[in-house]
Amino acid sequence: DLVNWKFERIVLPVQSDGILGPDRVGERVKVMKCPSTGEYVMYMHADDLGYMDPYIGYATCSTINGEYKLQGPLLYEGKPVKRWDMGTFQDTDGKGYLLIHHGPVYRLSDDYCSVEAEAAYIKDSGESPAMFKKNGMYYMLYSNLTSWEKNDNFYFTAPNIEGPWTKQGLFCPEG
């Protein structure tokens, strides 16, 4: 019910090696249920402790709270997506999207396990992307590029996920 929470289990334990092995971090976790497979797909930023080896990793599970199996890095055109700040969005038609800092919006494959195409590139964007859709309009939210420091948050709108995207300004008080 998103109000009463209880700990059930660690759903993706540290791996013995690889992108989530020892001396690596996994963060910014997002989970979507894939309509074509019925599986839950978890995405995360995986990196070394110095934040110099980023990957978007993914894991799958048949239940939302079961033990996920790390599948590896998410691939686009046969290469790992080496980014860090990301979000996800599932459209009303069931298509899944990976939202990346600095502008790329990647459309996921039907099974959500790889990137199919770059659906849009939002120029002059920021970090910590989040998207929602209301009354047929897409809204993309960002914060400025200041890492963990406080900053202003702004948004773009588009009538279609592929654009055109228009910067609208701040969505909360300045400062």
Regions found by a protein language model. Name each.
Residues 1-175:
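Carbohydrate-active catalytic/glycan-binding domains of CAZyme proteins
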